[in-house]
Amino acid sequence: RIFCIMIPFVHLHVHSYYSILDGQASISRLVDKAIADGMRGMALTDHGNMMGVKDFFNYVQKKKGGASKDFKKAEAQLKELQAKVQEAGTDPCSIVLDDGKTLADAMAETEKAMEKAKRVMDFKPIIGCEMYCARRTKFDKTLKEDRSGWHLVVLAKNEVGYHNLVKLVSRAWVDGFYMKPRTDKADLEQFKEGLIVSSACLGGEIPRKLLTGDEEGAEEAVMWFKERFGEDYYLELQRHEVKDPAQRANRETYPLQQKANEGLLRLAKKCGVKYICTNDAHFVDEDNSEAHDLLICLSTNHFVSDQSRMLYSKQEWFKTQAEMNEIFHDLPEALATTQEIVDKIEEYSIDHGPIMPNFEIPEDFGTEDSYREKYSEADLYDEFTQDENGNVVISREEGEAKIKKLGGYDKLYRIKLEADYLSKLAYEGAYWRYGNPLDEETEARIKFELHIMKTMGFPGYFLIVQDYIKVARKELGVLVGPGRGSAAGSAVAYCLRITDIDPIKYDLLFERFLNPDRISLPDIDVDFDDDGRGRVLQWVTDKYGAEKVAHIITYGTMATKLAIKDVARVLQLPLSESNRLCKLIPDKLPSDENGKVPKMNLPNAIAAIPELREAEASSDPLMRNTIRYAKMLEGNVRNTGVHACGIIICRDDITDWVPVSTATDKESGEKLRCTQYEGSVIEETGLIKMDFLGLKTLSILREALENIKLSLGIEVDIDMVSIEDPATYDLYCDGRTIGTFQFESPGMQKYLRELHPSTFEDLIAMNALYRPGPMEYIPQFIKRKHGIEPITYDLPCMEKYLKDTYGITVYQEQVMLLSREIADFTRGESDNLRKAMGKKLIDKLNHMYPKFVSGGEKHGYGSETLEKIWKDWTAFASYAFNKSHATCYSWVAYQTAYLKANFPAQYMAAVMSRALGNIADLSKFLAETKAMGIVCKGPDVNESFRKFSVSHTGDVRFGLAGIKGL
């Protein structure tokens, strides 16, 4: 069919692979196709959820960012060409450029490039959801008709609409879930502002009623929506005609659609409601239809060969404007009305600055109102734009921009109140940790850190973390780890007992945790004993409110092997062949000619492995199709889960900002709230993520301490044990570390016997070095400790930071400190250097190298020596370890070794009690216990407890739960 006029069209009913096991389309491919086809936008309307919305929004913003750069580049080129025209003073058609084009042609091409970029810049991501609307109310969950609901497409036309859609979808999950997440008309009426609604597919209320002959009921439904949504309510037409007689597809849908469409057009005219056409897209291209069919087989647990299984019409691809024009050539207004909807869509962002939860500060300390009376805006400006010593360090313009980024002066009063209270707690802790008065270095460090926390706007974060850690220790009886990750570099965190490692003593750096040159959210991971973690989370939920606390969703995708197995199963490829194909997939692909390791996916694996190429070209159609469709399904979302440790604590109801869904806790069976956006992007929306980790080793420590108390009547404060305990170092020197944390592998035992660690610093270094890559330096480290190899330094000043590791650079913090010592790098610059070296960012390193050399030369160091140091750093930096983390976990390891050395029976009983479900580990630990000379008595119904126990004589009694099958 030939058309004189192509009517613009956009897709307003689209499913991605976030319509889990129903949609097969990746968001990036959908957006790319829409842009390539010249569409002005597209909607994302996954079934019952908004899980793909952040991915959708981010990808469109990425495309727009690239287009903006292209536009500016082309604009600059056009100005240069126009200048040449003015300079020549002649017809641009007569001027020939070096590439043979005329100046006029070059200008036309440049203008065309600008137009193309502008179309992408103007592309509109339309956020929506195909919701399930309960046939009665969302609280009715008894009848068969309550199990799903009418389909309804809901689109957000502006920011208000987005937040209302978030509310609707969240409430559908939290309150209305019954087989499906269901909204109802009461909620639709309450949250209608800013929303555009269409009647959806054959599963919608109006089409269903029309098909059952209930014309009156259909009209009532249309009028209900029209009265509430007015001109933002549309009827939706679809046509999925199967034209290929040989194709196995659902041919019953199209006649029903045509019948429903007739009724919809009658109602549109009678009720004065406009109509649109959609294609209910579930996959991107026509040749993806069979892959989508396989996905439906996976979803419904059928083989492809099953004759009675569910079938789609296979017409549900993301059709081009031309294809939609052909299908709806007789209803041009249905195409044109999609443009009307696009025109209604406003530009807005779903991202937000940090939304810090409010920490309750005692009124006798101060309130926001009292601070407003006490401090002027000028006072706040000075405090938040000067350095910790009151020096002016930024311009007025930069200062005002900083105030605005922090939320304006109104927000600053809250931040200052929290910062002052944080300062009070920090100094109280500092006097307890370091004594009063503080020495000059400690005073300066705490003052600097508190200033950075305040001027970044995050004092409330630290107040909240120290609060739940304090409660965990003092009220809930939960063992808390000494810290993990870069947070241990903060002296303030140490003073607040967020961490238990002295960063000043161990040269741990605050800027490794918070870079003063770049505002970024703090990230404090906290370890709790895994028995007590749940109690801490419950306390947090009770304190802040269930509506303000949520877990974070995770998405399970079809990785390479899983895609092969899934496709092979529904195609009924023999299991032996499926397993053979999966075994061909390596854990890691070989490096290419440039030394880079390709991303693991099926196309790259096929390129690298001849046997997979043979399978792809096999004469066996089952084998060939397995590879073909596995490539198409690879990366599809297959299921959702819950982040192992990430928790959101919000100032407001979380559904004021992002959608939530629900999941079932595996242990308690309780329903958990989860954000529908995953952890990698959730903070972009302003929500604050905190990590609560369960560490089995802490449970072992806690249980060992209980065993000591029960059997010996002694209470041991594990956080206060001596760091110089001789028995503990004897244990390490002998390599008797089975059952201890992080030092129990045979290889580590061997190196410990060679090293003979005599200081805690030796243990930290071994913990950092015993990994692939830096492990090769361990023999040199051992030789230098024992004087077999001389300890050398490229510069005398390097001894200050390398002496504890015998002249070998082991930690990232050493590189940071030395860059400041040698070349006067700032704190922020040293952290940027650490990141650039660790990630091998060549451009950034090349930019920093001249500063390093010039800074070193100012101190009188030779350029050759500086070049050698730089090369050594860049070679080793990708292996260098985070000393803060190594120190924290070495302390936990030391605590386990201390208990094993000093309370062996009590400790090993705890270790075995935590290995009840693993016969191999239990046998290993039982053998170690006997080798230590401890009497291990068998199980006895009269004396055994569930777990392993220790008698007053020091014998270990076997726990009943350790008996297989009991």
Task: Indicate where each model-derived feature is located.
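Alpha-helical scaffold/interaction cores of sigma-54-like transcription cofactors
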Residues: I5-L966
